[in-house]
Amino acid sequence: PPFMMHGDVVKGVMSFPEMDAMMYKIEGEDLYLIGTSEHTMIGRFIDQTLDGAKLPLTLTSYSPCFRKEKGAHGIEERGIYRIHQFEKQEMIVVCKPEDSMDWYDKLWKNSVELFRSMESPVRQLECCSGDLADLKVKSCDIEAWSPRQQKYIEVCSCSTLGDAQARRLRLRFKDENGKTQLA
C-alpha cells in the first residue's frame, strides 16, 4: 500500500479528533502518512459503485504505519507499544450490510485461533461503547501474556464500522435488482 494518502480519504475513514491525534500531515500538501494500511485499502474504493455479485472483497496488507501517539502515556507504554513508526498486518472486508456482522465474527475467530495456535495465553475483551473510536459499531481486542511485562498486552483488535466509512467514502454496490446500496 502507499505510505501516504489524500485528505479526502483520511476524512472518509476516521473522525477529525482521531485524525488530529494520530496522523502526520505533510506540510504544504493534502497528504498524510498512513496510520494503518486499513485506511488505504478501503480508501481505494472512494466514489466507486461495485458489482454486488462480486462481494465480499477480502483484502490484507502488511505495511509500515506512522502515528503521533499524542497524549500522556505512562512509562510502561514506551518502546514497541507507543512508537511513531511500526509494522502492522491488516485485514478488511468490503461486503453487503447484511453480511457485515458475520464477517466481523469470522475475522475475530480467525484472529483468536491464530494466537491460540502459537500456544500463547490469550484473552478476549469486548470493548464497551465508551471505549470505541467515533466510527466503530463494535470492537474486540485480543490480549496475549507478556512474560517480560508480567501482564496481558493488546496484540490484535477486530472492529466493524457498519456503513460509516462506506457513507463517508461514497462506497456503494449494485444489488441483484440493480438498486444502489452502501457497502
What is each of the regions a protein language model found here?
Residues 1-183:
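TRNA-recognition modules of translation machinery and tRNA-sensing kinases, especially anticodon-binding
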